């Protein structure tokens, strides 16, 4: 049971100290979406994300109203796209755009997962995928990307670090006009 002090302290934190919940996240596996073509996979990805996360914004609003604490961002996070696009990495941007469209349909602030896990080594399909990141980030609004290039156990994949330097430079060039 909450005491009167607890309630007043919470109100004070929300009003004077601007307490909020920065982000709520729903994680989804996309492995069931993989098909023989990028186009079919992208369609399945869009459908699955829209179906499974359809209530994320409504639920966040209800929770915020119930507890009186603002929830700033609603985010969906998915399986790293490099894993589900391994058979057609040059067409991975189709999946990225489908994810961005799904985020817009849901009203989600961000959708994370246009990502690769190359901390141990970098396969040819992963290099090809990583080279698509600048194009995808330049042509989407809500999609987030990440590349894991190291870990305590595996060390740092310096080949991947070099590739990411080139990728950052290309992304900066393509998005120079954006804020």
Where are these regions (language model features)?
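Extended, Lys/Arg-enriched charged tracts that mediate electrostatic binding to polyanionic substrates
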Residues: 159-179
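Metallocofactor- and cofactor-centric catalytic cores in central/energy metabolism, strongly enriched
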Residues: 2-131, 147-166
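Conserved ASCE/P-loop NTPase catalytic core
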Residues: 143
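Acidic, His- and aromatic-enriched active-site or binding-groove loops in soluble protein domains
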Residues: 134-137
């Amino acid at each position: 049971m909450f005491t009167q002090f607890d309630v007043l302290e919470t109100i004070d934190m929300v009003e004077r100290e601007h307490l909020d919940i920065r982000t709520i996240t729903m994680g989804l596996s996309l492995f069931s979406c993989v098909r023989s073509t990028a186009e079919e996979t992208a369609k399945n990805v869009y459908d699955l994300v829209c179906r499974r996360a359809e209530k994320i914004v409504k639920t966040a609003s209800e929770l915020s109203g119930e507890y009186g604490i603002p929830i700033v961002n609603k985010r969906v996070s998915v399986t790293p796209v490099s894993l589900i696009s391994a058979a057609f990495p040059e067409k991975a941007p189709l999946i990225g755009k489908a994810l961005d469209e799904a985020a817009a349909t849901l009203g989600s602030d961000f959708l994370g997962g246009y990502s690769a896990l190359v901390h141990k080594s970098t396969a040819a399909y992963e290099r090809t995928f990583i080279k698509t990141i600048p194009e995808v980030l330049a042509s989407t609004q809500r999609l987030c990307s990440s590349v894991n290039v190291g870990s305590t156990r595996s060390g740092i994949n310096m080949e991947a670090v070099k590739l990411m330097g080139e990728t950052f430079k290309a992304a900066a060039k393509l998005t120079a006009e954006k804020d």
